[in-house]
Amino acid sequence: MRSKRFEALAKRPVNQDGFVKEWIEEGFIAMESPNDPKPSIKIVNGAVTELDGKPVSEFDLIDHFIARYGINLNRAEEVMAMDSVKLANMLCDPNVKRSEIVPLTTAMTPAKIVEVVSHMNVVEMMMAMQKMRARRTPSQQAHVTNVKDNPVQIAADAAEGAWRGFDEQETTVAVARYAPFNAIALLVGSQVGRPGVLTQCSLEEATELKLGMLGHTCYAETISVYGTEPVFTDGDDTPWSKGFLASSYASRGLKMRFTSGSGSEVQMGYAEGKSMLYLEARCIYITKAAGVQGLQNGSVSCIGVPSAVPSGIRAVLAENLICSSLDLECASSKDDSSSSV
């Protein structure tokens, strides 16, 4: 007979969560979809003519962008011929230096690096992450918002956040025209708490850039990239337009990251039957190809999607590891709680 205590615990909402059945055709699978391409590359006269089983005649915008700018072609064929299990072991081996691995990982195709991390369990990925992170010292970011967009409260909370040790602070707005007030309040409050804190205001991208140009923010992060072409074009974007936006920030010396996360293509309905991790790998390669120094990923606000299927959280850690392995600063993010989706 089961005790009443365990019956009561089992009925709690937190214990009602469980995995749902994978839906491969719609990309509702975290890792190793049968529709994921096999790793391959062919280079003719310094140009990629085949990428992950797809000839250049069938490339979409993302394939073209990655093939031209995202892969170190000097060692690509050598690395693609290496055993993926051996490469996975090198990633988590503390005796193999990061400086030895980055030239290899940056010469892989998206499908190859996904194959490599798919051989690793969570503990091995954690060990690899300690070694592969691009940032010298890990740090924390805080969100500073309130329901009424009250700039005085934002400034006060920002000061406390800075005093408590947060090196980056982000705010956003419900009404776009309030953005300058929120951005300035966050900037002033954070510097009162502790000089040197970086601040951002998450908005529609043109407005966000304008705030940076005016000096109201110190950096930007919410410049979204996606792993399939239909999701890009649905937002009137291409990898090239995102690259142009990145160069606009760079022209004023503003730090910026792209943002992506596994599950976004599933939510938008354009996953093309690929796994969430493979599509996220394409996002990471777009970031590398655009010359951006870092990426906010880790499923972010889509976390309820990968966490609902088997190996979902493992895939989220894997995308963070891929980001760091491509020598990008990884801002690991989870903006939502799994049980709220």
Predicted regions and their residues:
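Anaerobic metallocofactor- and corrinoid-dependent redox/one-carbon enzyme cores
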Residues: M1-D157, W163, E168-V341
